[in-house]
Swiss-Prot record:
Homotetramer. Initiates the rapid degradation of small, acid-soluble proteins during spore germination. The keyword Nucleotidyltransferase does not apply. Its EC number is 3.4.24.78. This is Germination protease. GO terms for molecular function: metalloendopeptidase activity. It catalyses: Endopeptidase action with P4 Glu or Asp, P1 preferably Glu > Asp, P1' hydrophobic and P2' Ala. One of its GO terms (biological process) is proteolysis. The keyword NAD does not apply. Transmembrane segments: none annotated. The lineage of its organism: Bacteria, Bacillati, Bacillota, Clostridia, Eubacteriales. Keywords: Hydrolase, Protease, Zymogen. Autoproteolytically processed. The inactive tetrameric zymogen termed p46 autoprocesses to a smaller form termed p41, which is active only during spore germination. Belongs to the peptidase A25 family.
Length: 325
């Protein structure tokens, strides 16, 4: 069977529903609109049956769809940051004096993969200040520390091993991970933020399966945030072929031999054929928008502000920005 590459739970549900024409048992889907035009979708995987069908662990997956032109409007960016913060706060159940460790996963030398390190560079880190100047830093300020550990190819160390060692050394009560994801659809690239309480597997979206970073491996809750920055080239080619076939079917005379041939094409077999034809030439080619540099900069700011607001509930965004400046 042709498996479409995606890290988004909302897309996994869509693929299953399209393939089997029914909802998944053990999965609850809820959609709402906040701040007038920001769509928030909750996908709750409740049991092993749902997890197997979705190909994802049991837990909650929140998808926030960013409005068009958000990257060019500071006001909308702040609105999305507050929606991200609200979604995080629903998943974070942590007293304000407890420590949070934020991990920016990814390769800072590769723009589509640099979202994690970029977010870390915009965070309000306070753990060191709470120790160095306890009289100046208010008790309501949460101790937050952050790291961008790089990738195995740069460090020679599994990212999961680095994080596990840090957790054992500094004893945080929560880990928040940020990583780049792969999407099924081009229109979701850099236009969607996924938040989950199930942890993350670095590099899984592009086929690099590393050590899992989750509560089971670290012993503390792990919240994962991700933004799709790439799409599999084979998926784009397959979608283009689907559009061509659909248009040819619409223009063909119903009941005629050519119409029947087009209508009986197995789309699953077609997807597998396209994948096998492209593999010798492009391998696992991933495609990203040409404006990815600007997109990563703005999305990282949105996510960083969302994390800052969620981890520092006693501060407003204006005060956080003053602190950072």
């Amino acid at each position: 069977m042709y498996n479409v590459r995606t890290d988004l739970a909302v897309e996994s549900r869509e693929i299953y529903k399209h393939r089997y024409n029914r909802e998944i048992d053990g999965v609850v889907f809820e959609e709402k609109t906040v701040e007038e035009d920001i769509k928030v979708t909750n996908v709750d995987i409740l049991n092993e049956e749902g997890a197997k069908a979705m190909g994802k662990p049991i837990g909650r997956y929140v998808t926030i769809d960013i409005p068009e032109y958000t990257h060019y409007d500071g006001g909308i960016m702040d609105e999305v940051s507050h929606v991200v913060a609200a979604s995080l706060e629903e998943l974070i159940n942590l007293p304000e004096e407890r420590t949070a460790l934020v991990v920016g996963l990814g390769n800072w030398n590769v723009t589509p993969d640099a979202i994690g390190p970029k977010v870390v560079g915009k965070l309000m880190v306070t753990r060191h200040l709470k120790k160095v100047m306890p009289d100046i830093i208010d008790d309501s300020v949460r101790p937050v520390c952050a790291i961008a550990p790089g990738v195995l190819g740069i460090t020679g160390i599994e990212t999961g091993e680095i994080i596990k060692s840090l957790v054992e050394k500094i004893n945080p009560d929560l880990v928040v991970c940020i990583d780049a994801l792969a999407s099924r659809k081009l229109e979701r690239v850099a236009r969607t933020i996924q938040i989950s309480n199930t942890g993350i597997s670095p590099g899984a979206g592009v086929g690099n399966h590393r050590m899992q970073i989750n509560e089971e491996s670290l012993g503390i809750p792990v919240i994962a945030l991700g933004v799709p920055t790439v799409v599999d080239a084979a998926t784009i080619a397959n979608d283009a072929m689907d559009l061509v076939l659909d248009e040819m079917i619409n223009q063909a005379d119903a009941g005629k031999e050519f119409y029947n041939i087009l209508n009986n094409i197995d789309k699953n077999e077609k997807g597998m054929m396209i994948k096998s034809l492209l593999d010798p030439y492009v391998g696992d080619l991933m495609v990203t928008p040409k404006e990815i540099d600007d997109i990563i900069e703005s999305v990282s700011k949105i996510i960083a502000n969302g994390i800052n607001i969620a981890l520092q509930p006693n501060m407003v965004l204006e005060d956080i920005n003053k602190f950072l400046n």
